[in-house]
Amino acid sequence: MDTTFVQFLFYRLDPAWRRLPEEERACRSTEFAEAVEGATEITTHAYNMTGMKAGTDLLLWRHGTDLAELQASASRLQQTTLGRYLDIAYSYLGLIRVSTYVRRQTPQEQAVLETERGTYLIIYPFTKTIDWYLLGKATRQGMMNEHIKVGHEYEHIRQVLVHSFGLDDQEFVVAYEAEDLMEFQSLVMELRSTDGRKYTLSDTPIFTCVHRPLRDALELLV
């Protein structure tokens, strides 16, 4: 399997952008969209963040097999006119790896390569405690089996697990795709009572994102 790098770029929009003439904003948004679409070796999914998380206005969820190209294309976006009004507020990086705990993945797991995205994407950086890694493998597997069983009860919710060990501050980036946020919240509440929960060191900040076609997401910035 080719190495797949996954990057979540959260942008903060300079308020000065909204004071530009409407026609100029529309033109410059098109320039930015063309720069995204021109990076043909990278898959990009767009999410407008307006009103969803303070300090964030746009998420680009990107993945590709060449980290240098991910970096170069991000730089090209920053060089567009709109890009000069966008500061990176948060950035998370990792790899897709075969899970240690799941023998055979279902369509719920590792949905990163799907072309159709869910309406809602919920993302958070995640790190386990040191004590978790000092447990025996069988003990960890047992707790993960409980976690996985709960997840499979919510079959309409898809998960992407990105491994960040040694590449970023967190150990994982966890992303869920859902059509019903009430259902997703029920999943989270149920997972809170599993045994593995006590070995969570951190799982914030949490980002709730709304998927839109790229040009629609940019239009909401206008």
Which role does the model predict for each range below?
Residues M1-E37, L67-E69, A89-E153, F165, ...:
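Short S/T/G/P-rich N-terminal loop/turn motif that feeds into the first structured element of a domain
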Residues Y11, N48-M49, L59-T65, P125, ...:
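A structural feature that tracks compact, well-ordered secondary-structure segments
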Residues T4-V6, T56-L58, T119-L121, Q170-V173:
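Short, surface-exposed beta-edge/turn micro-motifs
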